[in-house]
């Protein structure tokens, strides 16, 4: 998961593959990650992200002049094609051309069609794009990709600890729209991200990731994950998903991730090991 950095939502500069970044965000680090995963015979999606200074939402990126848009497009293309070349050279299964860029996608449709063509000229694997759960229907180029990518932080429950039944019934409702959308484009839906924090009310606003001192609640996380899997995983229009998130150097003696998205050292970890073994 490489990262490029933007100083402001309206500034076209993109900074990536620099020594001051975390190794895992750079070309060298991503290559090492891919090698590690492939050695374990795991399929890999390479999914570039943008981080805007102060944590501003990438879906709100917007330039205020044509000149800046053109410059930003050139910078973004350079970023994406650099990692598309890496994905091809390492035979990565799936490449994601962008993550949660709603405003950029809607305001510059011609650029995205051109970018997809250029990526296809250098990368021969499957392609997707990751749009946020509430704006995935605004993407105009799904029929040019192999999967409809959704970062699936749908609101599921307002309960402190959602029951498995409650969360399952909510997914049974949500999945009807997803199924219809998949049928419209004759393309499978892929959850390019899904997951829940292990906190009270984890299903209320699953996208919230601020480092708050929320009370840990492993059962909430577990029930929400189980419900999603039970409702969706056997559907033929659904391609599966990528769980957010996993730390390579997890310290089981630390409470740092006790109320975070990671399942490591929690009830969900034992469940996921069994679930993935059967799927």
Predicted features and spans:
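Surface-exposed cleft-lining segments at the edges of enzyme active sites
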Residues: 16-21, 68-71, 98-105, 157-170, ...
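Alpha-helical scaffolding segments of alpha/beta enzyme cores, especially the outer helices
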Residues: 28-39, 78, 82-85, 110-121, ...
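Aromatic- and acid-rich polysaccharide-binding/catalytic face
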Residues: 7-8, 80-99, 131-169, 187-188, ...
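Aromatic-rich peripheral "rim/lid" segments of glycoside hydrolase catalytic domains that contact
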Residues: 10-20, 202, 206-210, 222-227, ...
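Substrate-binding cleft and catalytic face of glycoside hydrolase catalytic domains
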Residues: 1-14, 25-105, 201, 246-249
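Aromatic- and acidic-residue-enriched segments that line the glycan-binding/catalytic groove
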Residues: 53-71, 145-147, 205, 209-210, ...
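Aromatic-lined carbohydrate-recognition surfaces of secreted/lumenal glycan-active proteins
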Residues: 43-53, 94-105, 113-137, 182, ...
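Active-site clefts of carbohydrate-active enzymes
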Residues: 150-165, 180-222, 244-260
């Amino acid at each position: 998961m490489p990262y490029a950095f933007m100083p402001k939502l309206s500034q076209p500069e993109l900074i990536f593959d620099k020594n001051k970044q975390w190794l895992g965000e750079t070309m060298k680090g991503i290559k090492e990650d891919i090698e590690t995963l492939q050695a374990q015979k795991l399929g890999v999606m390479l999914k570039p992200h943008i981080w805007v200074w102060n944590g501003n939402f990438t879906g709100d990126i917007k330039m205020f002049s044509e000149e800046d848009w053109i410059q930003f497009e050139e910078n973004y293309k350079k970023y994406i094609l650099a990692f598309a070349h890496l994905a091809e050279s390492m035979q990565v299964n799936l490449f994601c051309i962008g993550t949660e860029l709603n405003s950029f996608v809607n305001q510059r449709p011609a650029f995205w069609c051109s970018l997809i063509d250029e990526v296809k000229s250098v990368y021969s694997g499957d392609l997707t794009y990751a749009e946020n759960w509430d704006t995935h229907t605004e993407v105009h180029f799904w029929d040019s990709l192999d999967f409809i990518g959704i970062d699936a932080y749908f609101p599921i429950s307002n309960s402190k600890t959602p029951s498995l039944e409650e969360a399952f019934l909510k997914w049974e409702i949500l999945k009807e729209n997803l199924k219809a959308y998949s049928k419209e484009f004759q393309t499978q839906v892929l959850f390019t991200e899904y997951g829940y924090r292990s906190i009270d009310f984890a299903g209320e606003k699953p996208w919230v990731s601020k480092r708050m001192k929320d009370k840990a609640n492993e059962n909430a996380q577990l029930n929400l994950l189980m419900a999603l899997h039970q409702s969706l995983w056997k559907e033929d229009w659904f391609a599966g998903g990528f769980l957010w998130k996993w730390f390579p150097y997890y310290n089981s003696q630390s409470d740092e991730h006790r109320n975070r998205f990671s399942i490591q050292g929690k009830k969900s970890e034992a469940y996921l090991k069994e679930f993935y073994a059967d799927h």
